[in-house]
Amino acid sequence: MTNRIEFIITDRRPFADGQSFGEVGPYERLSGRVHFALDPLAAAQRDVVDLDKAARDPGGLVHCEADCMILKPVDLARGNRRLFYDYGNRGHKRALQFFNDAQHSNDPLTTAHAGNGFFMRRGYCVVWVAWEGDMLPGDGRMLLDVPVARNDDGSPITGTVRVEYMVDAPGRTSFPLSGRTAAHSFPAVSLDTRQ
């Protein structure tokens, strides 16, 4: 079997209000979804935990989808033929903030989001693809939709989850079970504390 990747563009528009970045020229923003069809038995996927326990299509492939955004020169021939991939921690797009000294935005589109144009003046394509399956929608976060791994009887795979709490201030006496409103917390399998 062969893995398949399909990028479905749902939005295409000028980036940075059509501003030209030196010899590279203007940029455009492509937004959409990437559809992955993965062979769970392939050597490259061997270390993906429980991938072999996800539902498969008739050809034996496992499917998932991720948000994707690309900033690229309108004329690719004027670019440097290099791609900068920002994995986007917790669904956020940070590369322009850190490399272009731009204001942070999960919806980069304006001249302010281009900042000093560091990537653009050098001709890079900048790409974000969601990679965390526990993010909730909101604030333009990148989302990844993954299948649920299941036991042979069809029930979801469950197990012990351990959490480490770090005290970061003197006098702290309690912690929320999930400190991130952007992350999906899975419900407890059982509320029986004797287990």
Predicted regions span which residues?
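C-terminal His-loop and adjacent cap/lid subdomain of alpha/beta-hydrolase
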Residues: 2-195
